[in-house]
């Protein structure tokens, strides 16, 4: 059974309220994980993952990004990322991570981004990478297919039962997505979309990503957004930048939402094993000290 999270509100640098959910383990946490969700979904869809991470000793935070979930609903801004677009979203996410650090001083903080959340996280690494003990990117790619390709994501899964068969082989999970009023581009129309269709490495300055930062890239091999090839290209790109610890895995036949796939237990076990091997008392810079933003 999923644990009911605590609800927080974090005011971002533009003065906008962001709704955040926190799942806390029964014992003192060994590290924190900040989950960044994808487009047209929301943070509480990661409750099952958060419960599993709690059982492994991790406190989990997940915010509803600008224009999404409770953040979008309570400000009547579903689908609207604000006047600064993607950069504003990244700064809002950074404010949440700062809250995590303030609530757990000295604890290593990891970030996990899914799909659009992985693109947010990659830009975050360029600007605030020293904040983190490690990064996990899933449902991701090196060069994004573009928002205009959304209508073609089901092409490989014909005859399709629903417009969202590309999300998962688990029909119950697809049906839950369809039934969720805070999911789907019909419910969350993109009222502003600068940079949402850029791949993980298509903007910003990669030279600012800390070389000591551990990164785990993992995709479903049948994911139409990146799949095995797009994920591998991103991992190879990170290695070419000089990062010391880059792990890549593609799961055969799995689709876009690995945490809602039929092999989700395998995926979660791999995530926990990766985190366990890297959870320390220092951040990725090795200092555990002050954090500085990059332009």
Question: What spans do the regions from the language model cover?
Answer:
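N-terminal cap/lid segment of alpha/beta-hydrolase-fold proteins
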Residues: 1-25
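Short beta-strand element of the alpha/beta-hydrolase
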Residues: 29-38
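Conserved alpha/beta-hydrolase
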Residues: 45, 50-76
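Alpha/beta-hydrolase active-site loop
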Residues: 81-102
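Alpha/beta-hydrolase-fold enzymes
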Residues: 112-188
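Short beta-strand/loop motif that positions the catalytic acidic residue
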Residues: 217-219
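Conserved alpha/beta-hydrolase "acid-adjacent" motif
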Residues: 224-233
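Catalytic active-site module of serine/aspartate enzymes centered on a nucleophile-bearing elbow/loop
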Residues: 245-295
